[in-house]
Design a protein with these regions (language model features):
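C-terminal all-alpha effector/ligand-binding and dimerization domain
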Residues: 129-136, 155, 168-229
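Hydrophobic, amphipathic alpha-helical faces that serve as interaction scaffolds
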Residues: 102-120, 149-189
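Hydrophobic side-chain positions on well-ordered alpha-helices
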Residues: 18, 137-141, 159-161, 205
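Short loop-to-helix capping motifs
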Residues: 32, 142, 163-165, 209-210
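Exposed, interaction-prone assembly regions rather than primary DNA-binding/catalytic cores
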Residues: 107-139, 143
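Short linear motifs at protein or domain termini
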Residues: 1-105, 112, 116
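Amphipathic alpha-helix face/heptad-repeat signature
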Residues: 95-102, 124, 131, 147-150, ...
Length: 229
């Protein structure tokens, strides 16, 4: 939970994590009053939280059954909040594996598509090159947040350059995985120099319109991140 979070954010995180963690089991019924007692939040806050959780497919509301917790196959598993709750809960290993598989399927293809777009005269790698260079600069600095911001910008730009709007919508999913890797898995460890070089190679391959090399280098980035876990 983020420091300084509002009462709404705290209650949402608490209930979302409870559903993901199985404290509130699929099929179980509850009430607004029960959620108020669990979170200590006001009725208006809890009502808003239940609307959000309903939108995420995590619970349903009905006059006779009250609030009912829904199973995981109903959840919006691509929402970054759901991803974060799963990464921070007992299901974290499964969520990491699913993120890894998603990145393997999506990012090399996005890098290849970006190279094709650039080769065909659509788009510019200026922002991508800047993000790759910022990663190198931030790796030497004291502020780890700057490195994460540059890393997120790099991967988001690859998706954007692909020319595929649907791939672009996966930006928040990829970013949540990068955030977890930077803040939880890597912790205080300095960024790997070889990985930094690979990011620059991806940018160079995209700029040169080399689909195969862009995909291969992006695949290597993901595989190295997986092996480091």
């Amino acid at each position: 939970m983020t420091a300084g979070a509002s009462a709404f954010e705290q209650a949402l995180d608490q209930l979302g994590a409870a559903i993901v963690g199985g404290e509130l089991e699929a099929g179980a019924a509850d009430t607004i009053e029960g959620f108020i007692a669990r979170t200590g939040a006001s009725r208006s806050v809890v009502r808003e939280v239940t609307r959000v959780l309903g939108g995420l497919g995590m619970l349903s509301a009905g006059r006779r059954v009250g609030l009912r917790i829904l199973p995981i196959d109903e959840w919006d598993l691509l929402d970054p909040r759901v991803i974060r709750w799963r990464l921070e809960g007992p299901d974290h290993a499964r969520q990491l594996a699913e993120l890894r598989s998603l990145r393997h399927a999506v990012e090399p293809a996005a890098a290849a598509a970006a190279a094709r777009e650039i080769r065909d005269g659509r788009g510019s790698t200026r922002a991508l090159d800047a993000a790759a260079n910022s990663m190198v600069e931030a790796a030497d600095g004291p502020e780890s947040g700057a490195f994460l911001a540059a890393d997120r910008a790099f991967h988001a730009e690859v998706l954007a350059l692909s020319g595929n709007a649907m791939l672009g919508r996966l930006r928040a999913v990829i970013e949540e995985g990068l955030r977890h890797r930077a803040t939880v898995e890597r912790g205080e460890q300095a960024p790997d120099r070889h990985d930094l070089g690979l990011h620059q190679e991806v940018a160079a391959a995209i700029g040169a319109g080399d689909e195969a090399r862009a995909a291969a280098r992006m695949r290597e980035i993901i595989e190295r991140a997986t092996a480091a876990r």
